[in-house]
Amino acid sequence: MLLNKMEVSMRNKKLLAIATILVGLIIILILSDMVGKIDNEENARVHQHIDNRKPIDETDTSLDITAEGFSTHLPVVILNTNGQQIMSKLDTDGDPKINIEVQIIDNEDSLNSIGDTPAVETISSVRYRGNSSLYYDKKQYALEFLNADGTENVTEVMGMAAGSEWVLNGTFLDKSHIRNYIAYNIAGEIMDYAPNIRFCEVFLYDGETYTYQGLYTMVESIERALDRVNVTKYDEDRIESSYIIRRDRFSEDEVMLYNYGTVNGLTEEWLGVKYPSEAKITEETLKYIENDISEFERVIYSDDYETFKTYTNYINVDSFVDYFVINEFFGNYDAGLHSTYAYKDLTGKLTMGPVWDYDGAMDNATPWELEPDATAFKTASWFNALIKDEEFCRKVVARYNELRKSYLSDEYIDEYIDELVDYLGASIDRDYQVWGYIFEQETLVNVENKYGVVNDRNVDTYEEEIERIKLALHKHAEYLDAEFYNDISGTIMYEPENLSSMRYLAIFFIATFFVIVIFVRQE
């Protein structure tokens, strides 16, 4: 009897051990599935066309763009110049900014009209912004809200978190109006942060006459702030600092870096410091940032594997993976070359983003068309080095495959576009009254593709442009679904030497499990 109890006790202990191992395996699998994923539930991204639909009747069909007859379901921005001329960097050797008055009309439950009580009323500096876009007829505006004493006026705008710096983007070459909106919002669901964006309609007022400027987006500019790029504030008494950098054209008006990659011709274009500001950054802090970037670049462009494999000590790998996937999916050929941001917190690693400037994405680049059956982003600075690592390539493709089941699926993208176009409604036609002649211009160069076929990308109607976006995304995604890994893995030089610690633990538990099973059966 005593022996039977002992046998039962031993058997129970063995079963308990097996159960413990099985639970451990389940936990390992769950944790493994979570690794590399970014939880954005707390970000609560607002999509204007979904979340800000007003309970109004269907009277927003008027095409009247006079101040007396105008009404819209979108917010209205009035730029009161009091007769001053808005300028750009091309118009003066000094500071092109002038101070104007800005009103934003954004009624909660009715259409918005000129003369309604403004939700926001502020002084603001303004200038024309952009590079090539400075030459377009429809201008873009950089705004900085100010108090009467000249200090920053940090204000909530159209439901976006309070800030002082804003961009009014007119997207003259984007005949669809929607490329930036789609890319920013979907990136905002995937990455830690992407600029929030709202559609609005804009009027210029010179003190006497209101002039309709068309359909715009109000966008959060990229700056250090709690609800934007949330890095530690710069302390001028310290050499080390958080920073925000941008890859773009060389500019004498910005603080440029002479980092290892640039000086040695390993990367394209130039890196400039966006934060800390030129007015505050010390020479010592500038040198610190330059050295910090150079140290990372020496690692990824090293021919020594022992050095190269330490790159994960310097960067937030997941952010680089997401940045690769988003820009490749949307065919943003300018990313990695221009308007390419990265940031680093004082206590963190170098992080890619936020995303910016998708006017030329989705087969809208002026000098070349999107090649559906090719991967372009693999040649971008820094990324052309990272894809030497098999593990990085596998992370990129795994993340892409994961997102193709949700935010990057054909079904999600098509429905998103259709609902957005429906939401914009008559605002598209009002804008067309002023800027519709863009459809008559050959704005996109019809270059010969690698098959010798010349494809005319200049469409005649808005509806054709929307279909062109969908088709470009579908074709490119179809290629990536089949060939993404094969395409980017062609330059792999380094295969992982060791399995991750998580996989080691899984193997250990599995091996232990089978040993115990064999032991129990022998008993």
Regions found by a protein language model. Give the residues of each.
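Middle-to-C-terminal accessory/interaction subdomains
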Residues: I28-D39, S132, V273-L337, D345-L505, ...
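N-terminal module-boundary/linker segments of secreted carbohydrate-active enzymes
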Residues: V35-L111, D116, E495-P496
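Short, solvent-exposed loop/turn and secondary-structure capping segments
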Residues: K89-T92, S113-G115, V154-V157, R179-N180, ...
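Conserved oxyanion/phosphate-binding beta-strand-loop segments in alpha/beta enzyme cores
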Residues: N112-G170, Y288
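Internal "kinase-insert"/substrate-recognition segments embedded within catalytic cores
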Residues: D149-G150, A161-W166, G170, D192-P195, ...
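A conserved alpha-helical element in kinase catalytic cores
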Residues: F172-Y193
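Short, well-structured beta-strand/strand-turn elements
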Residues: I190-V202, N332
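Beta-rich nucleic-acid/ligand-interaction surfaces
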Residues: F199-T211
